[in-house]
């Protein structure tokens, strides 16, 4: 099994603490020396024990030169990071202007909502009214444009549905034509019982006898001689 995580805390036993300090100090000084040799780095190490004893290491010949270089670097970084008085003044003025602009916008918003109208003068109320009227015009114009766009979209969908309906109707008509039974061919000639010459086919059905009776006519027998008229036969000179 692996070793558990070691919790770093102060060693309470004084002798053990001194022994551990000596070991870790020597290891730290050795690591600083190796780092300066292997990486050609300028290393300065300052260490004070619990009793106040100083231990130090410097890769250069003089520790003070390394410390002076460190101080110059730190102060230069602080001077570059710290803003000048002019920059601070400009930043503060910009902050004040932005804050005032935000307050004006908030007050204008409250006035448009009908709030805080008591302090406004007549001309300010007129300007506010004009602004509200312009805003309403813009809102109505935008609303009209949205409605027109929706109407155009609905018309486009309606046209698409009509086109699809026509296509379906045409397909249904084609299906009905294909499913209809074929009609037999019609011959215009009509043959009699003897197979003789043809005659003209009449599409009108024969009229029954009661049809002539309804018109005041009677069926006539061709083998019977015609009846004399009511006044008798006419004279021979009229025949």
Swiss-Prot record:
SUPFAM superfamilies: SRF-like. It is found in: Nucleus. Keywords: DNA-binding, Nucleus, Transcription, Transcription regulation. Residues 179-208 are annotated as: Disordered. GO terms for molecular function: DNA-binding transcription factor activity, RNA polymerase II-specific; protein dimerization activity; RNA polymerase II cis-regulatory region sequence-specific DNA binding. It holds the Pfam family SRF-TF. The gene is MADS34. This is MADS-box transcription factor 34. GO terms for biological process: positive regulation of transcription by RNA polymerase II; regulation of transcription by RNA polymerase II. InterPro entries: MADS-box/MEF2_TF, MEF2-like_N, TF_Kbox, TF_MADSbox, TF_MADSbox_sf. Probable transcription factor. Residues 1-61 form the MADS-box domain. The keyword Transferase does not apply. Residues 88-178 form the K-box domain. GO terms for cellular component: nucleus. Gene3D superfamilies: Transcription factor, MADS-box (3.40.1810.10). Highly expressed in leaves and at low levels in roots and spikelets (rice flower). It comes from Oryza sativa subsp. japonica.
């Amino acid at each position: 099994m692996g070793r558990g995580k070691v919790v770093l805390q102060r060693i309470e036993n004084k002798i053990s603490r001194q022994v551990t300090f000596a070991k870790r100090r020597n290891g730290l000084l050795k690591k600083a020396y190796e780092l300066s040799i292997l990486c050609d780095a300028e290393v300065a190490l300052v260490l004070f024990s619990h009793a106040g004893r100083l231990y130090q290491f410097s890769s250069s010949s003089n520790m003070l030169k390394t410390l002076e270089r460190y101080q110059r670097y730190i102060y230069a970084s602080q001077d570059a990071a710290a803003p000048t008085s002019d920059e601070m003044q400009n930043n503060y003025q910009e902050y004040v202007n932005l804050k005032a602009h935000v307050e004006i916008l908030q007050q204008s918003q409250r006035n448009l909502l009908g709030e805080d109208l008591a302090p406004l003068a007549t001309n300010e109320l007129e300007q506010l009214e004009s602004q509200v009227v312009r805003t309403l015009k813009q809102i109505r114009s935008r609303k009209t444009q949205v409605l027109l766009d929706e109407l155009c979209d609905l018309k486009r969908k309606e046209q698409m549905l009509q086109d699809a309906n026509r296509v379906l109707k045409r397909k249904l008509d084609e299906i009905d034509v294909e499913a209809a039974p074929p009609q037999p061919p019609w011959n215009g000639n009509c043959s009699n019982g003897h197979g003789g010459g043809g005659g003209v086919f009449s599409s009108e059905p024969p009229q029954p006898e009661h049809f002539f009776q309804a018109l005041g006519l009677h069926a006539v027998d061709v083998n019977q001689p015609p009846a004399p008229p009511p006044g008798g036969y006419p004279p021979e000179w009229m025949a």
